[in-house]
């Protein structure tokens, strides 16, 4: 399970889209996996009439315009994904859906707004996820030199990798 963290406009959504595509397509060393993508605001897949306009991978099922919490539950029940990807966790109902994802055997790939791990830990939702050691890694993006730059990668305990 991986959480991408950055302030708005630093490349979380773009990096998430690229990761989804690469996980879905696979490569010569790693086989592709089925990915369930909840695209609540249409920023990831950019669907038009139900067809993704952005490349999110050949094994990716997209729920477009669906609330994150509902979408995660729907994907688990009906699409059998190996990986569930969502953008911008933050609401209490997202937390309950995240619990379902992690307890059903799926891998979670998500993003959250914040400047640092400490920043998002001010929210009880993320405090609980960290205490449960849900995320194996936290990837912090920033604006140093350019948007989308990886500033830090932390393990599930918040220690540098």
Predicted regions, residues:
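P-loop NTPase switch/communication element
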Residues: 24-75
């Amino acid at each position: 399970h991986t959480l991408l963290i950055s302030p708005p406009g630093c490349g979380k959504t773009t990096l998430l889209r690229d990761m989804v595509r690469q996980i879905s397509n696979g490569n010569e060393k790693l086989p592709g996996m089925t990915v369930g993508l909840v695209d609540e605001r249409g920023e990831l897949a950019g669907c038009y009439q139900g067809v993704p306009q952005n490349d999110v991978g050949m094994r990716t099922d997209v729920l477009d315009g669906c609330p994150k919490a509902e979408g995660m539950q729907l994907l688990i029940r009906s699409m059998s994904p190996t990986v569930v990807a969502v953008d911008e966790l933050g609401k209490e109902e997202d937390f309950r859906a995240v619990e379902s994802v992690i307890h059903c055997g799926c891998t979670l790939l998500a993003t959250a707004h914040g400047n640092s791990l400490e920043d998002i830990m001010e929210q009880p939702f993320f405090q609980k996820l960290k205490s449960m050691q849900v995320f194996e890694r936290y990837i912090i993006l920033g604006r140093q030199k350019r948007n989308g730059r990886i500033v830090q990668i932390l393990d599930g305990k918040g220690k540098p990798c």
